[in-house]
Amino acid sequence: MATISSTLLLNSSRSALPLRFPKFSGFSSSSPFARSYRFGRRNLEPLSNGMLSSGSRADGATAAAASMEGVMTEAMKLIQSASPTWKSAVANNLLIFVLGSPLLVTGLSASGIAAAFLLGTLTWRAYGSAGFLLVAAYFVIGTAATKVKMTQKEAQGVAEKRKGRRGPRSVIGSSAAGCVCAFLSIYQVGGAAFSQLFRLGFVSSFCTKVSDTVSSEIGKAYGKTTYLATTFKIVPRGTEGAMSLEGTLAGLLASFFLASVGCFLGQITPPEAAVCVLASQIANLGESIIGASFQDKEGFKWLNNDVVNVINISLGSIVAILMQQFILQNWVK
């Protein structure tokens, strides 16, 4: 494993004050954290040259240097933590959110980012960097699909509000089932026997949601003919409970891709990835039927998109867990 070290020289008229960044061993120089560290170092060093022009500034810089060194040491220790803790989860999440803020603001409102930060912290605490990367992949895919043909969607009145920037209710509605699985994993409910089931439910919930988002957004952008899930009657794009061939295929591919990411990251096995894809399609069909049958109907005004999202991803998680227990487990044996 590589060692990361650097020396930052703060020059003044009185003296040159060396600030030595701590040596961090135990993680690869090619890791995202190492690259981020080097990026920050390269940008700090030029700014430091000539920064100090008086003795008083030099004295202040000495204290600041010592403080910065302590903060950096503690932060990198948390990042390298083998077993995720709440402290390491917050530190890692904060670092990634700062570096990824240009992307985050394109897909989330300010309050949505706050909700996503809580989700990211919980995910890292439960499943470490692998779980976090899975959720990040979901966010990138979903945001990209939402932006497809945005002008056309807005003209037709079927685009997401705020140029597709999701708020806190959308974030919570899209991650509720995953959060439940994460909490159950953190506190080891049911012991080791249930640990992988909760992990499977977590992955399946996001496979379900990414499939739902992509199928909806691509269907609104490219769907040639849109059918109501309950009657197969042709309806306008954007109708609740409507489906299109183009959107359905895109959603299936998105679910397959995210399940493959989960498999690659070691969160699930290949057979479990197949379960996630199948469960996501079953859940999305169920959501379409619910939307077509009840949403926007008299007596069901409470059944808005956020509530339907919770039902959808919960179905995806539950179906995947049941399939694992009653079908896949027996088939593997």
Swiss-Prot record:
It is an enzyme of class 2 (transferase). It is found in: Plastid, Chloroplast membrane. The chain crosses the membrane at residues 94-114, 126-146, 171-191, 248-268, 274-294, 307-327. The keyword Transit peptide applies. It comes from the Eukaryota. GO terms for biological process: phytol metabolic process; vitamin E biosynthetic process; vitamin K biosynthetic process. It is a multi-pass membrane protein. One of its GO terms (molecular function) is phytol kinase activity. Pathway: Cofactor biosynthesis; tocopherol biosynthesis. Disruption phenotype: Lethal when homozygous. Tocopherol-deficient plants are unable to grow photoautotrophically and infertile. Vte5 and vte6 double mutants can grow photoautotrophically and display a stay-green phenotype with strongly delayed senescence and an extended lifetime. It holds the Pfam family DUF92. GO terms for cellular component: chloroplast membrane. It catalyses: phytyl phosphate + a ribonucleoside 5'-triphosphate = phytyl diphosphate + a ribonucleoside 5'-diphosphate; phytyl phosphate + CTP = phytyl diphosphate + CDP. Belongs to the TMEM19 family. Overexpression of VTE6 results in increased phytyl-PP and tocopherol levels in seeds. This is Protein VTE6, chloroplastic. It comes from Arabidopsis thaliana (Mouse-ear cress). The gene is VTE6.
